[in-house]
Regions:
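Conserved coil-to-alpha-helix start sites within the AMP-binding
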Residues: 84-89
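Acidic/polar N-terminal loop/beta-strand segments that form early-domain functional surfaces
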Residues: 24, 58-59, 83
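Phosphate-binding glycine-rich loop
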Residues: 29-77, 91-95, 100-103
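ATP-dependent adenylate-forming carboxylate-activation enzymes
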Residues: 103-112
């Protein structure tokens, strides 16, 4: 295990992103508004070859849905990186499986 601190990434957001967020907030439809449906439609048509997709409220929810769709559940063990956000292990536990943490390579940030 490394004792060296690995800094997390800083998001890069510009005027376009700020304007889009402002429009959503001003609409009052933050969870299931037209922008969410437009995103789901565009994502499913351009990224996942027309397979239906659903936007969720958090990374934890996204990981949880992915685990359930993959059949991961009680009695399973899932290897997860030790350098990660809490959602990684929490979503595994929420699915009924056991998260098993493994060290990451400090250069590549991949499982070591």
């Amino acid at each position: 295990m490394t004792a060296q601190f690995i800094p997390p990434a800083k998001p890069i957001l510009g005027d376009d992103e700020r304007k889009a967020v402002d429009e959503v907030i001003a609409s009052g439809m933050v969870a299931q508004g037209p922008q969410v449906h437009a995103f789901e439609d565009e994502f499913s048509s351009q990224v996942v070859d027309g397979v239906h997709c659903v936007a969720v409220n958090s990374g934890t929810s996204a990981l949880h849905i992915g685990l359930l769709a993959s059949g991961i559940g009680e009695g399973d063990e899932v290897i997860v990186p030790s350098f990660t956000f809490a959602a990684t292990g929490n979503s595994v536990a929420l699915s009924g499986a056991k998260p098993v943490f493994a060290d990451v390579d400090p250069v590549t940030f991949t499982l070591d």
